[in-house]
C-alpha cells in the first residue's frame, strides 16, 4: 500500500514519543527508507529489508532467503508488506529499544533537524 504523509501520520500516531522519537522523525525516516510504500523490499549484501521500516531478515524477521535469521521479532518478513501496520510498529519499537534510532541510517543525516516538513498540516 502506498501511504501519504498524513495517512501514515494517522496510522503511526501511537509511536510519537516512543524512545524519545517524534512522529515527524518516523515519517521522515520512512519516506527515505521506503517512500511510504509497504511493499518495498530491498536486497543488500545478501540480506533483505522489508516494508515501511525496512526491517532486516538477518536479525529481526524470517524469510525463505535466510533461514538462519535470529528472528527477534518472531515474525515472517512478508507480514511487513501488508496494509496492517500493527506488527511493523511492534517490531520497529523493539528495534528502537535495542539498537536506537540510528539503526535507520537515514535518521542522522536527513531526519534529525528541520522536521516541520514531515508534519501533517491537519494538526
Curated annotation (Swiss-Prot):
Give all residue intervals belonging to the C-type lysozyme domain.
Answer: 1-123
Keywords recorded for this protein, A-Z: Calcium, Disulfide bond, Lactose biosynthesis, Metal-binding, Milk protein, Secreted
| Disulfide feature | 6-120, 28-111, 61-77, 73-91
Task: Give the InterPro entries listed for this entry.
Answer: Glyco_hydro_22, Glyco_hydro_22_CS, Lactalbumin, Lysozyme-like_dom_sf
Report quaternary structure and partners: Lactose synthase (LS) is a heterodimer of a catalytic component, beta1,4-galactosyltransferase (beta4Gal-T1) and a regulatory component, alpha-lactalbumin (LA).
PANTHER family (UniProt xref): ALPHA-LACTALBUMIN, LYSOZYME C
Q: What is this protein called?
A: Alpha-lactalbumin
Organism, scientific name: Camelus dromedarius
Amino acid at each position: 500500500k502506498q501511504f501519504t504523509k498524513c495517512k501514515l501520520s494517522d496510522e503511526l500516531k501511537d509511536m510519537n514519543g516512543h524512545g524519545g522519537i517524534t512522529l515527524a522523525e518516523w515519517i521522515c525516516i520512512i519516506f527515505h527508507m521506503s517512500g511510504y510504500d509497504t511493499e518495498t523490499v530491498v536486497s543488500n549484501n545478501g540480506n533483505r529489508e522489508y516494508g515501511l521500516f525496512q526491517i532486516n531478515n538477518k536479525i529481526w524477521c524470517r524469510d525463505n532467503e535466510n533461514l538462519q535469521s535470529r528472528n527477534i521479532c518472531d515474525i515472517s518478513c512478508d507480514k511487513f508488506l501488508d496494509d496492517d501496520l500493527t506488527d511493523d510498529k511492534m517490531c520497529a519499537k523493539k528495534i528502537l529499544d535495542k539498537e536506537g534510532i540510528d539503526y535507520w541510517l537515514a535518521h542522522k543525516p536527513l531526519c534529525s533537524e528541520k522536521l516541520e516538513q514531515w508534519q501533517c498540516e491537519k494538526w
